[in-house]
Design a protein with these regions (language model features):
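Small cysteine-rich, disulfide-bonded extracellular modules of the LU/uPAR three-finger superfamily
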Residues: 1-97, 104-131
Length: 131
């Protein structure tokens, strides 16, 4: 089972640069542990996609998320996305262990990270396989 981890910078970025209702959110795949990146994306001020080593997406289906609903209660933002299926086509995708959610719309900071899922071990999607 995957474990969700919030990126601390998202609290600041979501308030200052994100428009939850209209922005485009995308998944990014990585096989590099956040703490092993040359600039860890979990560090203060580093929560952007540029600090994540991504896998090649040549054989991967669309990674764009569709917002199902969002709400805010007592300072807690809840953002729900429709289910998404990633499919490898024409070759493999990965290996990857971490799946980041980032906001693809803001330009400053560009591509702020909301959080990531840690699957506990690396996986590779072979052609025709889905996640």
């Amino acid at each position: 089972m995957a474990t969700y981890n919030k990126i601390a910078d998202w609290a600041v970025n979501s308030e200052k640069t994100a428009n939850i209702g209209t922005d485009t959110f995308v998944l990014a795949l990585s096989n590099t542990a956040p703490g092993s990146e040359s600039t860890p994306p979990t560090g203060d001020g580093n929560g952007v996609l540029a600090n994540v080593t991504q896998v090649s997406y040549t054989n991967c289906s669309s990674r764009t998320l569709t917002t199902a609903s969002s709400s805010q209660t007592s300072g807690t933002l809840k953002l729900d996305f429709n289910d998404i299926t990633l499919t490898a086509s024409g070759g493999s995708v990965g290996p990857f262990r971490y799946i980041y959610i980032y906001d693809d719309t803001p330009t400053s900071p560009a591509d702020p990270l909301g959080g990531y899922y840690d699957y506990g071990s690396s996986t590779t999607l072979s052609a025709g396989e889905t996640l």
